[in-house]
Amino acid sequence: MIFNRDDPNTWPIFRPLIIAHDVGRSRDRSTAVIGGNSPVQPRLLGIKELVELPQGLYGSPRASALATIDRNYNCNALIVADLSNDPTYAETLLETFGARVIGLQITRAGEGMNPERRPVKNSSMLIYTIGRSYLLELFHAELQADQVRFVDGPMSRRAYEQLNGLETEFRESGIVYSCPPGQHDDLGISCAMLAWAARHPHLSAWVDTASFERRPRRPRQTFGWAAFT
């Protein structure tokens, strides 16, 4: 396949590969949006695949569905997961994906820069807090700067329609984006999460940590008295 900078489906690699995982509520679908930075233009973001997980999945079944997608990419992606609606999901994700998981708490305010290292079972996870409007504005700025490339397909168009359909309200604190009643924004939010992660100054540190955890460990050598005789 010939490389085309405007078609992420032709990109041989992403630097790095990221899966943005929006965790839906009971009436919404959880999603996985896969992409990352271009191999030849670090500021160009490519969105290669957009997936809506089956409705009604929670906990381990939801993580298993995400793991199926992850295996299609050789289990080599950073997982950026929205933990806003279910903080306990962090434990399941950590058990399934290990140190590749970065948690995101989407709230009313926050710039998503200073993480909290939250204890999770016998380990810990970085959790970043970001305002919903701030997250969407970041993605909007990337779109306006022509720094995002979507794979062509119905799911990309659905994500665009979700973003385009958001209602805006101007308040003293800034613009508030809300989803109209009966509509969904899960794919659109996942795209914004992907863009946030791809532009984050901690990205290289996340990659280094994930790479170190996947590195095979040398077995510890033990020496008996026979080794010295």
What residue ranges belong to the model's regions?
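RNase H-like, metal-dependent nuclease domains and their acidic two-metal-ion catalytic environment used
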Residues: M1-T107, N114, S133, E137, ...
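Short, charged, surface-exposed secondary-structure boundary motifs
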Residues: G110-S123
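Conserved RecA-like P-loop NTPase helicase motor core
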Residues: S123-S133
